[in-house]
Every structure is written in structure tokens, then in C-alpha cells.
Amino acid sequence: RLTNEDCKVLKYCTDMVALDLGHNKVTDLSFLEYMPELKILILVDNWLTDTQSPYLYDLSMLKYCPKLMYLEFFVGDVSDISVFDYLPNLVDLNISYNPISDVSHLLNFTKLERLYIEHTSLTEQDYELLKETYPDAYIVYYGEGSVDQGWREHERYFAMIDMFHNNYVNDLFKN
């Protein structure tokens, strides 16, 4: 598993468009300050066993990634999502299994198409507000798995996987 120390060199990848750090031991995202072109970021299930808060809990460095379109961040310890105010271009967002309770930072996306918020601290009223705010978006509030109900069955998911395997940027992520 990659660690915080391993990821320090990522700050030199200033043209990075897609980054998968899922299922590692990364909780320091300071390298994101140098990735303004990033459009895809996977931070699923990052944890340390020797800290008081074993899961990744601070997403504040995402503010340096304004072009971010796809954020897969489930199974964490994030409660403060105010950084989402800096991410107007999010299209796909999965923040399931995080103790998120403030819906206000989820209400200003201009391009949102998919939002997964299973097992968060958001209320039924928050869910209804999100459905009103994004009537054309697919929003998952109920479920028993962070990738159930189609998260990994969407064309952007398959395009992203192909990008990782073949080292190119798919047209779906060029906008």
C-alpha cells in the first residue's frame, strides 16, 4: 500500500489528469496543490492504523483541483466538505460511508449527474432537498454498498478504467 511518504513526489506531476489512490494508506493530500489539471480522483478507503482518526478525514487540498469532474471517496472519516464549494465541475461524486451532515456544500454543483450519499449523516430532508436541487441527477441515499446501484456500471467509469490501462484522456473527460 502507498503511504504519505510515497505520495510526496506526486507534486511533480503537475499535468496529472487522473489519479487512483484507492485502498492505500494516504491521508496527506498536500501534493494536490500542484495538480490543477486533475479531473479524476479516487481516494476510496485510505487509512492509517496508528492515528486517532484512522481514515482520511481532510479533503481541504481539493481546492487546488477546480477541474475535478469525478471524485470517488467512500469509506472515510470526512465530515467537513466545505471544499466542495471550490469544485463546481463535479459530475460524479460518491461520498458514501463518511460522517457528512452538512448538505449546504452539496447544493452548488453546475454539472452534477450522479451523487452517492449512502450511510452518511445526511437526513431524509437533505435527500429531498438534493433531489429538488438536481432533478435530473441520479442520487443514491439508500443502499448497502458504496458501489451498488450502478456506480461502476456507468460509461464514465468504464472510460476512466480504460484511461488508466491505456494512458490517454478519454473525450468524456476533456471538457
Model regions and ranges:
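Concave beta-strand-loop units of leucine-rich repeat
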Residues: 1-27, 31, 37-79, 83, ...
